């Protein structure tokens, strides 16, 4: 029997902590601003 893949988890992650989710709220935009200011290569950790 084949194992089931972890389908859908990436979509869930993206919906909660993706770029567009961050841009939606003022707090999320602050997160992005701080990560840009710190010089993070990746703004989103998904």
Curated annotation (Swiss-Prot):
Primary location recorded for the protein, binned into one broad class: plastid
Cellular compartment(s): Plastid, Chloroplast
Domain of life: Eukaryota
Pfam families registered for this protein in UniProt: Ribosomal_L34
InterPro entries: Ribosomal_bL34, Ribosomal_bL34_CS
One Gene Ontology cellular component annotation held by this UniProt entry: ribonucleoprotein complex
Protein keywords: Chloroplast, Plastid, Ribonucleoprotein, Ribosomal protein
GO molecular function, a single term: structural constituent of ribosome
The keyword Magnesium appears for this protein: no
Disulfide bond positions: none
Keyword Ribosomal protein attached: yes
Biological process terms in GO annotation: translation
Protein family: Belongs to the bacterial ribosomal protein bL34 family.
NCBIfam families: rpmH_bact
Name of the protein this chain belongs to: Large ribosomal subunit protein bL34c
Species of origin: Guillardia theta
